[in-house]
């Protein structure tokens, strides 16, 4: 399971606080550095291979020449993955680029649409138009992509219910296999953050954001999409494999400036509960030379327990890391697991946490957690997912 961070964008979105640089794209030296890092970490990559995914995120990976994408994939071990995703901006897609991605072996594309209102797109400093987004989607379809994810944003002050509903309904006409919806957040270091500090932008109320979120839930449910994670919906059989593995804390290798990694023991059982393990390679807990032997097996089910993060230096790979405590691992399991419809094992809840006992009455538990479809698991019901952060905070 490999993540490649591409910290380059042609322009910066109003709300973006991620590490990235505005440019026409990276030079060959950057690609050389990522390939060198992949080679240096080949043992880690082999140890995380059970999930069998490669994900190019950013930033804007579609600023990369096709040659760079292919070279980096080769350095990671090849071009054949159960799921190989590249994030794209609609403005970067041409018939030739879409066909080139497909010919490399990329089998999933995640496209940032955000809105189909041209005025809202201009306010966000997005480079594409509503019509351009639709054209890009059709180009990807024509290139043979049968697994496309589309991102949208809600909770924007100035985005009316009608505007959001129009965006969702139009995207449903395209019938993408996967849809992600994210609430606008004010990030430190973003242009929007500066506007908010100066009083030039006021956040939409929680009540209005909640109404928009549940409008999306209703529209996608009626269209046959499965709501399998707080921000993610999929047609049957089209859940995001890579992201689902994150939510079960599967080990992954993050390549490139600013990328994070998680290493250590891993039991595929938890992952298989979210994604059928039809393509999982046989796996045994590795000895991680790259973590100084910190990939230690915890008591009970094996859990990855070493987190590292790369520097943001574009000229070479350096990283730092920490061995996670049992308490930190448990917190991550709860925070990530309760974002999903599958929830978390009941064993993660302390007996003193009355809210964690499904047998208690609705009044006593305040409807915080209910049994999920997975035996012995508890989840936050969809009607409370908008306030999931508050519920999770009460459990950790």
Task: Please describe what each predicted stretch is.
Residues 385-396:
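Short, amphipathic alpha-helical interaction segments positioned at domain boundaries
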Residues 367-374:
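A short, conserved structural fragment
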Residues 376-380:
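A generic structural motif
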Residues 350-361:
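Short amphipathic alpha-helical interaction segments
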Residues 1, 20-44, 50-288, 292-350, ...:
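C-terminal scaffold of the Radical SAM
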């Amino acid at each position: 399971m490999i993540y490649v961070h591409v910290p380059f964008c042609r322009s910066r979105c109003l709300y973006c606080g991620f590490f990235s640089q505005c440019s026409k794209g990276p030079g060959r030296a950057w690609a050389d550095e990522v390939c060198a890092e992949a080679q240096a970490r080949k043992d880690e990559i082999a140890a995380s291979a059970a999930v069998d995914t490669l994900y190019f995120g950013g930033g804007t990976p579609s600023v990369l020449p096709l040659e760079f994408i292919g070279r980096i994939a080769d350095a990671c071990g090849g071009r054949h993955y159960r799921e190989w995703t590249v994030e794209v901006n609609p403005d970067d897609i041409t018939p030739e680029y879409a066909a080139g991605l497909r010919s490399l072996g990329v089998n999933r594309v995640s496209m940032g649409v955000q809105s189909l209102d041209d005025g809202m797109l201009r306010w966000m400093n997005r480079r594409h138009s509503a019509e351009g987004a639709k054209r890009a989607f059709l180009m990807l379809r024509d290139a043979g992509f049968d697994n496309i994810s589309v991102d949208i944003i809600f909770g924007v002050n100035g985005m009316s219910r009608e505007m959001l509903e129009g965006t969702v309904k139009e995207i449903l006409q395209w019938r993408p296999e996967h849809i992600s919806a994210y609430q606008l957040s004010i990030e430190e270091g973003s242009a929007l953050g500066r506007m908010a500090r100066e009083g030039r932008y006021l956040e939409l109320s929680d009540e209005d954001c909640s109404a928009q979120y549940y409008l999306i839930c209703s529209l996608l449910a009626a269209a046959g999409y499965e709501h399998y994670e707080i921000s993610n919906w999929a047609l049957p059989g089209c859940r995001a494999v890579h992201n689902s593995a994150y939510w079960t804390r599967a080990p992954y290798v993050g390549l490139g400036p600013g990328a994070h990694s998680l290493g250590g023991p891993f039991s595929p059982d938890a992952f298989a509960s979210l994604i059928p393990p039809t393509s999982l390679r046989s796996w045994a807990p590795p000895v991680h030379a790259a973590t100084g032997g910190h990939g230690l097996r915890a008591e009970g089910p094996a859990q990855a327990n070493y987190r590292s993060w790369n520097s943001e230096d574009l000229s070479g790979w350096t990283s730092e890391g920490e061995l996670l405590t049992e308490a930190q691992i448990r917190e991550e399991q709860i925070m990530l697991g309760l974002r999903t419809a599958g929830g978390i094992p009941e064993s993660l809840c302390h007996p003193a946490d009355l809210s964690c006992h499904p047998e208690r009455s609705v009044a006593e538990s305040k409807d915080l957690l209910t049994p999920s479809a997975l035996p012995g698991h508890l989840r936050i019901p969809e009607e409370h997912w908008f306030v999931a952060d508050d519920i999770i905070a009460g459990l950790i």
